Amino acid sequence: MDSLYNNNYSYGEFIDPRDGQKYRTIVEKPGWVSVPEFEAFAQNLNYGVQIKLDATEFDDSKVEKYCYDDDPWYCDNGYGGLYSWSEAMGLPKACDSVWTGTTPACPDSIFPGWKYEEEWRDLMIQGACPEGWHVMNETEWRALRGMDKSLNGHALISKVSAGLKSSANGTGFSALFGGMTELPTQYVRIEDLGVYHLPLEHEAERHKSVTMSNQTDISYRGVHYKKDGLSVRCVKDY
């Protein structure tokens, strides 16, 4: 696990009181007026009960996650869990199929002013993150990207995923390419793609995300189906 990180940085540690898991954390200092600094997990979230890719019954009283190839090794060795959007946002499973706040099965909107899309950038939604932390939002992702002097996104990516690129993990953020699920049939693109949830709806069944790879720069507001399993990073509330 030590190979995932940048040894030139001093990492903190957070113990999730819900299950005792330990996460390395890092204080990023982008220097933005709106986000001068923030503390983030330097690992993908790995909280919840593992379910199989072909699962058809779900329990809204628990956080449920996928592990790549249905193998818990991936969850437990830095790649973390893969979560549907509803699980990542702490919402009922029905919210993967409708706009939040529009049906009795998904009664609570994560942001009542959803028509004003720019206002979603700063949302702090706890979701599957521990109390006092929230799912990393678009403003935080953009601020972190602004710290990348390589201008290609590699400074956010662990050398385990970025290979021998000299700019890899210059921010200490240590992103891994954990792949994703394309429900209902397959896990895809491990070690090729890292896709992270944003608290931002796009359509009834789709949402916006952050995508990174070795081939392209970071893409903000990519569109994925809410049912697809993606990674989550948590940021401490401020």
Locate the predicted segments by residue.
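Conserved positions within compact, well-structured domain cores
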Residues: 1-238
